Amino acid sequence: MDEAAAAEAACIDIASVPADVLFHPEHRTVAPTIFSMAGQTHTECSSPNEYLKWCNSALEKGADALYCSGSFKTVEMLSNEYIPVVGHVGLVPARATWTGGFKAVGKTATDAMELLKQVKSYEQAGAIGVELEVVPVEVANEISKRTSILVWSMGAGAGCDAQYLFSNDILG
């Protein structure tokens, strides 16, 4: 709860909140104005119905949006249930072996176009945003210009709508 209280005191607008913190009864007491996003991985919620159940529970506990690493069909299903969903594109740690390890993604024109395709798929599925992780700055800038959803940069430069930073980096 200390990080949540510190983020509130520092006027942080948006926070990625671990499920154990989100489900703590004091979370919304110490961080009433922060837009809180929480998530489960595709291994923790293996079906669309499991995601739906978990998301509804998280919204009841105070989440404002949910990360979803499930399929685009899962994102669409959640969106159709009026659940604000954020996707994840680029270096997705749980899938790093699929993209060649822990390194930048989107360095070739073909790979950059694939990232744009994924972002557009999230957009078409009804996501409110996407986290773009470890993507070349120029690619992130162009993707941000070509989508109507919010784009959070995590190691993808300042050209996105918001920066994803860790609490140690901004709170000390």
Indicate where each model-derived feature is located:
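Alpha/beta enzyme core
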Residues: 1-172
